[in-house]
């Protein structure tokens, strides 16, 4: 039996849902931060198991969604510089900036390439030593270490044609900004566990405090 099988047992799920309904005596609003949580909650039909008093809200956990139009405009401008190769994740290609998108810039002649990791971008730099290669880095704390590793590798290999345009965001300030705005009254936050394994739980201690 796989460890995850116990979490997908129908009887266990029904028992947990019944316990939640029994304890739910007032309206509660919960926000999940991570886009992976949003996907899993919808995929497994969690909202249908919860009482109407429990309202699940999706937070800013999508790297694409939190990348500003201004940052995209700058990335597009870099890609349009002669000889520059811009590399990034496929999710970013069709995201609009203020005037155009990376896909449209690519169609217009810019050398924009989809990679699956910053290490792939490093390989592009190795293969094109006479051209500047820029990696558009997006995401939160979980994607930053791999980008940092690529930078250290480039330094060790003296790849002076490799640079990173980092648009990484920190998850605790993003959550704090939502709470401070006062527009959404939250009773709890389902925090991003994978982020906490990188930065530690102390960064999120402001929530219970």
Question: PLM ranges: what are they?
Answer:
Residues 1-130, 144, 148, 152, ...:
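Metallocofactor- and cofactor-centric catalytic cores in central/energy metabolism, strongly enriched
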């Amino acid at each position: 039996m796989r460890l995850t099988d116990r979490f997908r047992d129908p009887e266990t799920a029904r028992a947990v849902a019944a316990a939640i309904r029994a304890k739910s005596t007032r309206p509660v609003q919960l926000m999940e931060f991570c886009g992976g949580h949003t996907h899993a909650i919808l995929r497994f039909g969690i909202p249908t198991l919860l009482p109407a008093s429990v309202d699940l809200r999706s937070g800013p956990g999508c790297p694409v969604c939190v990348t500003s139009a201004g940052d995209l405009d700058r990335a597009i401008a870099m890609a349009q510089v002669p000889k520059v190769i811009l590399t990034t994740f496929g999710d970013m290609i069709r995201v609009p900036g203020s005037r155009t998108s990376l896909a449209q810039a690519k169609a217009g002649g810019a050398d924009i390439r989809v990679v699956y990791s910053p290490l792939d971008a490093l390989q592009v730099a190795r293969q094109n030593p006479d051209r500047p290669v820029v990696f558009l880095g997006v995401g939160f704390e979980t994607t930053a270490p791999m980008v940092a590793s690529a930078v250290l590798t480039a330094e060790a290999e003296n790849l002076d044609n490799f640079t990173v345009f980092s648009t990484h965001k920190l998850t605790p300030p993003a959550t704090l900004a939502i709470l401070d705005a006062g527009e959404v009254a939250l009773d709890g936050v389902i925090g991003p566990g994978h982020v906490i394994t990188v930065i530690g739980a102390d960064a999120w201690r402001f929530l219970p405090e």
